[in-house]
Amino acid sequence: MEKKLSSENNQLSSENILGLLPHRYPFALVDKVIENIPGERAVAVKNVTINEPQFQGHFPERPLMPGVLIVESMAQVGGIIVTQMQNLPKGLFVFAGINNVKFRKPVVPGDQLIISCDLLSIKRQRFGKVKGEAHVDGKLVCSGELMFSLVD
């Protein structure tokens, strides 16, 4: 599948994202990219809806988006940055670690996560690190550093 950007502000549609990332329902956690500087930075949207499967058990009486899924959403935005880097080998980059992750506010159905990631480093064309932040209504809800590794 060819990787095409929409013409407006280098945005990526959900179809573009599916062409870049291997994730599929129910684990595709990025709805669209609203700012995209390939290999450097991406800002994306994740709309949190009550019909997502995790809310059946987390928690039925008071649904909260699990923190691990917020972090995974940030990792997927980081993956969008890495997969567009022309000088890296093609292959599957996987989540390899997290540092300094903090959860500051709960995320609930109806919220819209605005996730920004900035590339911090690439080493030996196999390992990457991004800084990620997730905001709801302009308030920081999660932040941290995420590491990626190319698997053979």
Curated annotation (Swiss-Prot):
Keywords: Cytoplasm, Lipid A biosynthesis, Lipid biosynthesis, Lipid metabolism, Lyase. GO terms for cellular component: cytoplasm; membrane. It is found in: Cytoplasm. It catalyses: a (3R)-hydroxyacyl-[ACP] = a (2E)-enoyl-[ACP] + H2O. It comes from the Bacteria. It is an enzyme of class 4 (lyase). Its EC number is 4.2.1.59. Its main location: cytoplasm. GO terms for molecular function: (3R)-hydroxyacyl-[acyl-carrier-protein] dehydratase activity. It holds the Pfam family FabA. Signal peptide: none annotated. The active site is at 58. NCBIfam families: fabZ, PRK00006.1. Belongs to the thioester dehydratase family. FabZ subfamily. This is 3-hydroxyacyl-[acyl-carrier-protein] dehydratase FabZ. It comes from Prochlorococcus marinus (strain AS9601).
